Regions:
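H-loop/switch region of ABC-family ATPase nucleotide-binding domains
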Residues: 82-83
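Helical segment within the ABC ATPase nucleotide-binding domain
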Residues: 61-73
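ABC ATPase "signature
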Residues: 106-107
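Conserved signature/switch motifs of ABC ATPase nucleotide-binding domains
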Residues: 20, 41
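Catalytic Walker B motif of ABC-type/P-loop ATPase nucleotide-binding domains
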Residues: 46-49
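Conserved ABC ATPase "signature" region
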Residues: 2-16
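Conserved ABC ATPase signature
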Residues: 21-25, 29
């Protein structure tokens, strides 16, 4: 169990924090520990629900880099709820745009981001992407 723990902490870039009390970790570090804990169960699917929403903008990249690594190096399906549109476009095989609890549009990242068909999707992307 200890070897698995150390391997997972290394995977999320926190092996140097193995003796640290959780309260002394930053929000981004705590989120990466949470990801490592989930991976300990060897899941085939992970649900990631707004994993960066409560983080300082300066540490969002730490968490997104862990997800990038998992996406490239592990046979793992990830279902992610996010407002990080650039990141979603970069790593996704399929994207769904939800509004008021309903799927308004879905497709490949290229289809949805570069050529949205639904008017609400167009409005959302215009507002979000122009803000960034």
């Amino acid at each position: 169990a200890e070897e698995i723990t150390l391997d997972l902490l290394d995977l999320v870039g926190l092996s140097e924090k193995k003796e640290e009390h959780p309260s002394r970790l930053s929000g981004g570090q705590q989120q990466r520990v949470t990801i490592a804990r989930a991976l300990a169960m060897r899941p085939k699917v992970m649900l990631l629900d707004e994993i960066t929403s409560a983080l300082d903008p300066e540490v969002v990249g730490e968490v997104l880099n862990v997800i990038r690594s998992l996406n490239k190096e592990h046979d793992l399906t990830m279902i992610m709820v996010t407002h990080q549109m650039g990141f979603a476009k970069e790593i996704s095989d399929r994207v769904c745009f939800f509004n008021e609890g309903k799927i308004f549009e879905q497709g490949s990242p290229e289809q949805l981001f570069d050529n949205p068909q639904n008017e609400r999707t167009k409005q959302f992307l215009h507002a979000v992407l122009d803000a960034n």
